[in-house]
């Protein structure tokens, strides 16, 4: 059905049952049995965007190690989880797309090409408004990210014979954070680097 897609679908769990979020979302959107496939047609999906997102997650080892056990609003779920994979989920030109939120070239970040400068001087009068954040909203924060650590081998004597919830604290160096924001990724994240990047 999705013969033009060259990501890791159909699911072939060769890497110890490790999946990528773009592939899971694409399957959820196109599968008529347990997903939205009876409502979302193939032509309503930007496969190139999903492929780019799948490559991005694969290159950065952003795996989706979880299950969708409860009914979810697909759009809300996709947008929320996309952000924790440094992706954005959108509808562009009538097609659902999932793309890296940062400019990328292959597996690395690239500088964005500047197309133009938009300021008060070159925009129609009264069509441009500048709004500044209050000083309280600009204070540095600390982010507490929870993720799941699991045993990587079948050796029962190794650490992690049961999943362990780990926490990573991320803050800007040189500043004392005034507030701590919590981000729970234990449902699907098992990589410390992924948790910190999110």
Model-derived features: positions:
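Secretory-pathway-linked proteins and extracytosolic
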Residues: 1
């Amino acid at each position: 059905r999705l013969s033009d897609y060259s990501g890791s679908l159909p699911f072939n769990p060769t890497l110890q049952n490790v999946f990528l979020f773009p592939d899971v979302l694409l399957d959820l959107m196109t599968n008529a049995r347990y997903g939205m496939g009876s409502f979302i047609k193939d032509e309503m999906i930007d496969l190139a965007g999903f492929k780019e997102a799948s490559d991005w997650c694969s290159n950065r080892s952003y795996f989706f190690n979880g299950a969708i056990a409860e009914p979810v609003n697909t759009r809300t779920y996709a947008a929320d989880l996309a952000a924790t994979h440094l992706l954005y989920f959108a509808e562009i030109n009538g097609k659902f797309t999932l793309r890296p939120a940062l400019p990328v070239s292959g597996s690395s970040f690239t500088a964005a090409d500047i197309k133009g400068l938009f300021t008060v001087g070159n925009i129609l009068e009264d069509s441009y408004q500048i709004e500044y954040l209050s000083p309280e909203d600009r204070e540095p924060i600390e982010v507490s990210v929870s993720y799941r650590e699991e045993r990587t081998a079948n050796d029962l004597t190794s650490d992690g014979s049961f999943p362990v919830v780990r926490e990573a604290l991320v803050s800007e160096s040189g500043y004392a954070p005034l507030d701590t924001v919590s981000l729970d990724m234990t449902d699907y994240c098992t990589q410390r680097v992924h948790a910190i990047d999110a």
